[in-house]
Amino acid sequence: MKIWVDADAAPVAIKEILYKLADKRKVETIFVANRVLKLPRSQHLHFRLVAAGADVADGEIVRLLKKGDLVITADIPLASLVVEKGGTALNPRGELYTKENIAERLSSRDFMQELRDGGVETGGAPPFSAKDKQRFANAIDRILARLR
């Protein structure tokens, strides 16, 4: 099992949790981004640089993903592809995407996009909080215990 991180938009606090977790759990963790990231030295941490462009990192993650891998992403279309391919998708706020909830999440995302495209101001996600960080840490611990 590997952990893939859609790293371009991942909060720093989540990356820091993943750095520690990779060594503690001895799980290969690959950060995929279209700009260079400095990672701590570790045999368990890896970085893949992809070309700039919409969904390039997503495509690389889906291409390399194996059934049973875990993907950290806030990108709902990417999460949908991960679930479809037999992977597990977790967002940085600790929400697990599943076969049971991904269609609803995609539908809601698409609806909000239609509103924005129509000029409606929908606001954004609330700022990333300490509670979000804790929810993520708890969720990834549960997932890794189940997957390993």
From Swiss-Prot:
UniProt cross-references to NCBIfam families, sorted A to Z: PRK00124.1 (NF001095)
Domain of life: Bacteria
Family: Belongs to the UPF0178 family.
InterPro entries attached to this UniProt entry: UPF0178
Protein name as catalogued: UPF0178 protein DP1304
Coiled coil: none
